[in-house]
Amino acid sequence: MKRTKFIGLGIALATLLSFSSCNDKMKNETTVDKSEPTETVAVIETPDYFMLRPAVEKAYGYSHAVKIGNSIKISGAVSMDDQGNPTAAGDLEQQMKNCYADLEKVLKHYNCTFDDVVVENVFTTDMPKFLEFAGYRTEIYKNHFPTGSWLGVKELAIPEFMIEIELEVHKAE
């Protein structure tokens, strides 16, 4: 019985010492920053909206692009004329070129180039055909390729559209 009490007392003492040791270690590792407090200033950035084809975009209820700070989100570009009518019906290669031409106009509005693009998402109703012409992108992205996804979809907003390309841009100031 004495031995059991002694062992129990030893365990209790060891536990107490380990807690004490942890507290001492924390006290030694804890430092107090005695420097002057700093003030954090939040910058409120107003979105800058851009419409490539205002009448069409108002009719469908979207903006082609919005810039907030150094980031620009560009809505999916499709092959259409200024009245919103599909162009190059049945010709995915030409539709893709038309998309990039429109995207370039938006980029230029914000003084950007395809070198500033960090994300490109492509939606197509004909992935095998898109893969045939995807090499055209090397003419667009001369220095590096952005991240992104290529997605095969059942349909786009208007049946004649075969491809839609959306971008995200980061412009260092």
Predicted regions and their residues:
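Surface-exposed aromatic
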Residues: 118-120
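Bacterial Sec-dependent N-terminal signal peptides
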Residues: 1-32
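N-terminal presequence-like segments and the immediate start of the first folded domain
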Residues: 20-98, 105-110, 115, 124-173
